[in-house]
C-alpha cells in the first residue's frame, strides 16, 4: 500500500479539511472570517496577559486532557496566568456537594474576576456543566471563548464572545482540531 491511498493519509486530509473549514462567530452570532476569529481570540489572550487576568480552561474527558496540555503551554510559552479547574479532589468535592453540573461554575463564582477569561472546550457543546460555567463567568463580568463541534445548533456555539466550531461528529477529529487551534494560539503568544 502506498502512502497515496493509505487510510492514515485520508484521515489527515479529513482533519485538514475540517480545520480549514472551521467557523468563527462573535457574541452576536455573526460570522467572522478565519483571520478575524483567530486574531480576536489572540487579542483576548494578549489582553489577559497585559492585565494579569486569569485564563481558566475547562473541558470533560478528552477535552479536559486537551486543556490540561494547553494550560502548560499557555504558562510556559504564552506567559499567561492560566488555570484548569479539574483537580481531582475539587471535582469530587463539588460534584458530591453541588452536583456535577456545577463542577466548574461553583469554583468560577469564587475565583473569577471581571476581565478574566474562560476557555470552554466541549466536542458536543451540550455538556451542562460547561454551559453553567460559561454563564457563571459572564455573571462575574469575565470573557468567554468556546471551542465545540458536532451539531450546527449546539448551545455552546453561541455562548462565547468568540466561538470556534468544527463541523464534524467525529470525536477524534474534533478534539485534534481543538488542540491544533489552541496550540496555534499558544505559538503566537510568545512575547
What feature does the model see in each segment?
Residues 1-191:
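Conserved N-terminal alpha-helical segment that immediately precedes and caps sugar-phosphate-binding
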Amino acid at each position: 500500500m502506498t502512502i497515496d491511498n493509505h487510510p492514515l493519509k485520508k484521515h489527515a486530509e479529513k482533519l485538514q479539511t475540517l480545520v480549514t473549514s472551521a467557523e468563527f462567530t462573535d457574541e452576536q452570532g455573526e460570522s467572522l472570517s478565519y483571520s478575524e476569529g483567530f486574531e480576536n481570540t489572540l487579542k483576548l489572550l494578549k489582553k489577559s496577559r497585559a492585565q494579569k487576568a486569569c485564563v481558566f480552561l475547562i473541558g470533560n474527558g478528552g477535552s479536559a486532557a486537551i486543556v490540561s496540555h494547553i494550560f502548560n503551554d499557555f504558562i510556559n510559552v504564552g506567559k499567561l496566568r492560566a488555570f484548569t479547574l479539574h483537580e481531582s479532589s475539587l471535582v469530587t468535592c463539588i460534584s458530591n456537594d453541588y452536583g456535577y453540573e456545577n463542577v466548574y461554575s461553583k469554583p468560577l463564582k469564587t475565583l473569577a474576576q471581571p476581565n478574566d477569561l474562560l476557555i470552554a472546550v466541549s466536542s458536543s457543546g451540550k455538556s451542562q456543566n460547561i454551559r453553567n460555567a460559561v454563564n457563571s463567568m459572564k455573571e462575574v463580568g469575565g470573557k468567554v471563548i468556546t471551542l465545540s463541534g458536532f451539531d450546527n445548533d449546539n448551545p455552546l456555539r453561541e455562548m462565547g464572545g468568540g466561538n470556534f466550531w468544527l463541523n464534524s461528529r467525529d470525536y477524534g477529529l474534533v478534539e485534534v482540531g481543538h488542540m491544533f487551534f489552541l496550540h496555534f494560539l499558544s505559538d503566537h503568544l510568545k512575547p
